[in-house]
Amino acid sequence: MPVSPSSVSVLPPTSLEQILRIRAERNQRTPKCARCRNHGTTSALKGHKRYCQWKDCMCAKCTLIAERQRVMAAQVALRRQQSQEERDARDLEVLLGSAGNANDLLDILRLDAGEHHGKNHASPTTNNNNNTEEKYEDSQGQRSSPSSPTGSETVVSTSSPPELSSESTPNTSGSVIPTSPVFKPNGYSSMPMFNPVYGRPFMRFPMFSVMPHFFGTPSMSDFASAASLAAPPAFFSAQPTIATSSPSTIFPQTAPLDYSHRLMKNEEAEEEYRENDKTF
């Protein structure tokens, strides 16, 4: 009994190829592998590109397909670039308010980016040479005139305090030697240290005769008001004031008088001066 074609189509598929063929017939827009089609077979492209048995074929048809795919990919990349440039131009039009200026600015930015990229590739050797020349010039200037600051040292911010000057920065050379035995910031007078720990020499041994330059800190003269604290160091005595209230030959008192003793001494001097005025 002959089987009609209508009954064949009604029969369920018996193999995977029939199932794939039926699905391909139902959905005609499913992309197919072009290499497999060139070689007489039909296979869906989804998930098939890696496992295609003709993916490395170098025949004329497959080579033409590969070239066509390359051209299409380049066209897609070009369209994406053009659309991105159009979006940038629209954004610049919103900012600048004119289409011509936006396009010109896009061209200028593109040219500047290309020139900057080329300079970055060509400039490392020149930058290194310039840096070495500048370092050599700075070292020569510091050797010739240690007391005169170089160009990099003279740039000091106006908002910074005087103690952050170029002489106290760690970048300066070691040939710059401070004039005073104990380093003091420029612009400030030497203030007294009322803390006995800082006002005494090491271990309180009589070392003034051995190393007088270590204890050459000028002491404060007698003062009665806070305004005399700002007096310049020229009015201070050169020798430190030594307390003799507890004399000792082994451990002499080498610390200067503290603030309270100075005030008491100053008050006694004022009373004596008033008494002398009354008598005269």
From Swiss-Prot:
Recorded hits in PROSITE patterns, A to Z, give:
DM_1 (PS40000), DM_2 (PS50809)
Polar residues: which segments have biased composition? 141-156
Q: Which UniProt keywords apply?
A: DNA-binding, Metal-binding, Nucleus, Transcription, Transcription regulation, Zinc
Q: Which family does it belong to?
A: Belongs to the DMRT family.
Native organism: Caenorhabditis elegans
Instruction: Identify the DNA-binding region of this protein by residue numbers.
Output: 33-80
Question: Can you name this protein?
Answer: Doublesex- and mab-3-related transcription factor dmd-5
Q: Which GO terms describe its molecular function?
A: DNA-binding transcription factor activity, RNA polymerase II-specific; metal ion binding; RNA polymerase II cis-regulatory region sequence-specific DNA binding
Gene Ontology, cellular component aspect: nucleus
- Predominant place of localization: nucleus
Kindly give the InterPro entries that the UniProt entry links to this protein: DM_DNA-bd, DM_DNA-bd_sf, DMRT
Keyword Metal-binding assigned: yes
Please indicate which superkingdom the organism of origin belongs to. Eukaryota
As for what it does, the entry says: Transcription factor. Required for sex-specific synaptic pruning, probably acting downstream of sex-determining transformer protein tra-1.
Tissues in which the UniProt entry reports expression: Dimorphically expressed in the dimorphically connected interneuron AVG; expression is observed in the AVG in males, but not in hermaphrodites.
Biological-process GO terms, alphabetical: male anatomical structure morphogenesis; negative regulation of synapse pruning; regulation of transcription by RNA polymerase II; sex differentiation
Recorded consequence of changing residue 54 to R: In gk408945; alterations in AVG interneuron synaptic wiring. Suppresses the ectopic synapses formed between PHB and AVG neurons when AVG is masculinized by cell-specific expression of fem-3 in hermaphrodites
UniProt lists compositionally biased (Low complexity) regions at 157-173
Question: Region (Disordered): which ranges?
Answer: 116-182
